Curated annotation (Swiss-Prot):
Localization, UniProt: Nucleus
Keyword Transcription regulation (UniProt): yes
Biased composition (Acidic residues): 456-468
GO molecular function: DNA binding; zinc ion binding
Coiled coil spans: none
InterPro entries: BTB/POZ_dom, SKP1/BTB/POZ_sf, Znf_C2H2_sf, Znf_C2H2_type, ZnFinger_BTB_dom_contain
Gene: Zbtb8b
Name of protein: Zinc finger and BTB domain-containing protein 8B
Sequence segments annotated as region (Disordered): 436-484
Pfam family, one: zf-H2C2_2
Domain BTB: 24-92
Transmembrane segments annotated in the record for this chain: none
């Protein structure tokens, strides 16, 4: 058996002990106010007090005192009453303070209660606002209806419907339709005003004239903006301008007729783009621009294109924020957001992603992504058609160079090549004075063939080498020979 009221009675007894300060073994000071409580209650409900009692209170037999600086006294009093009674006193003024205090004291149940209260309060406020808005709308509608009825009564004669002698026929309810629809036939009259008639169907049968409740009301014209209608009007205007242009072209020479056709096409293109972008001008503006363009065309063939440019400049000047976008086909990179106008530029850009180098050097095997890089490399590193001075022995070579000399600037003897036949073929020392003329002619031809030329001074200038390397290399080489 379980007693349902036992927990409530136990909490009531503990709350009475707290109020009378019976067996209270701890005190909490909040903003100068002292609150008496029991450790067991605080330990069981608050994670903050549980950690405080476990780690910081060593003397369990003495009276303990805790001080809270963040929590307000009113919020802590409300939370303490909830711990001993199970009832949380919340209102719109203290709900935020209580929720923040409960969050600091690690009391999740109180935090959830506060959140639920806030949601319900917001729902109630929204519901009240909706009801107030509906009531205000109904009051405004009633006031407007009363004002309209009063105005109609003051304007119309006392006879009611007889005053509006517009040839209005009787309204007959259709017995087939169960919704009380009316068939109204009104003769053409310029002085009558439209009336809104509300029919009340009595007992689902035929409707007599007495059963009709007539509520006259003046209907004001409603102005709506229809993009489709504006486009149709623009097309009609273009068609109207097309016929005069056709007659004008028949009486003009061929070149003038061609200019007029080209100009009318551009005007139509501008108008269509203007309508498509949403910046539709009024009918008067369109007539003004079109007439201005036609006047410019009638002046002569040389002024036709200038008139079109005038229309375009006027459009840009009036709508400075809108830009007429000309469709251009862009090539997109499949690896990144890069776009290019030419397919070759995109292909060269894709090589940076794939690592492709389609231009190899025939001499050293190095590969390049662009052909101009290969040409610059061949001119600056592999200069086989020009006299080169060996970095080791200082000999000048003009014939077919070996692989080592072309790549590293050293002759075969300096690169430890022992084949004498290759040395005789490759190494041909000549006098520098005899080679100057040929070198100048070679340089001129190179500059004509290769406009981009990069020369390294370290490979051609013998004075740029370090003097420390000469005694280590020259003892191992034969004596330099000179040609007379």
């Amino acid at each position: 058996m379980e007693a349902q009221s036992y927990c409530a009675k136990l909490l009531g007894e503990l709350n009475e002990q707290r109020k009378r300060d019976f067996f209270c073994d701890c005190s909490i000071i909040v903003e100068g106010r002292i609150f008496k409580a029991h450790r067991n209650i605080l330990f069981a409900n608050s994670g903050y007090f549980r950690a405080l009692l476990l780690h910081y209170i060593q003397d369990s037999g003495r009276h303990s005192t805790a001080s809270l600086d963040i929590v307000t006294s009113d919020a802590f009093s409300t939370i303490l009453d909830f711990l001993y009674s199970g009832k949380l006193d919340l209102c719109g003024e203290n709900v935020i303070e209580v929720m923040s205090a409960a969050s600091y004291l690690q009391m999740n149940e109180v935090v959830n209660f506060c959140k639920t209260y806030i949601r319900s309060s917001l729902d109630i406020c929204r519901k009240m606002e909706k009801e107030a808005a509906v009531a205000a709308a109904m009051a405004a509608a009633a006031a407007a209806a009363a004002a309209a009825a009063h105005q109609i009564d003051s304007e119309s004669p006392s006879s009611g419907l007889e005053g509006t002698s517009c040839g209005t026929k009787s309204f007959v309810s259709s017995p087939v339709d169960g919704e009380g629809s009316l068939d109204c036939t009104i003769s053409s009259c310029d002085d009558c005003h439209p009336l809104e008639l509300v029919a009340k169907d009595s007992q689902g049968s035929g409707v007599s004239d007495n059963d009709l409740c007539v509520v006259p009301r003046r209907v004001e014209p409603k102005v709506e903006f229809d993009v489709a209608r504006v486009e149709v009007e623009a097309d009609e205007q273009l068609q109207q301008y097309a016929a005069p242009l056709a007659h004008m072209e028949e009486g003009l020479p061929s070149n003038q007729a061609l200019d007029l056709t080209y100009s009318s096409y551009h005007v139509k293109q501008f108008l269509e783009a203007l309508l498509r972008n949403g910046a539709v001008q009024s009918k008067d503006d369109l007539d003004c621009h079109s007439s201005r363009g036609l006047e410019g065309r009638l002046e002569g063939p040389g002024v036709a294109m200038s008139s079109v440019m005038d229309v375009q400049n006027d459009w840009y000047r009036e709508d400075a924020g809108d830009v007429l976008v000309v469709p251009i086909k862009l090539h997109r990179c499949p690896f990144c957001p890069y776009t290019a106008k030419q397919k070759g530029i995109l292909k060269r850009h894709i090589r940076s992603h794939t690592g492709e180098r389609p231009y190899p050097c025939e001499t050293c095997g190095k590969r390049f992504t662009r052909q101009e890089h290969l040409r610059s490399h061949a001119l600056s590193v592999h200069r086989s058609s020009r006299p080169i001075i060996c970095k080791g022995c200082r000999r000048t070579f003009t014939s077919h160079l070996s692989q080592g000399l072309r790549r590293f600037g050293l002759c075969d003897s300096c690169t430890c090549v022992t084949d004498p036949q290759e040395e005789e073929d490759d190494l041909m020392p000549v006098n520098l004075s005899l080679v100057e003329a040929s070198s100048e002619s070679h340089e001129k031809s190179d500059t004509d063939d290769w406009p981009i030329y990069i020369e390294s001074g370290e490979e051609n200038d013998p004075t740029a080498e370090d003097s420390d390397d000469k005694p280590h290399i020259r003892p191992n080489l034969p004596a330099p020979e000179t040609l007379t």
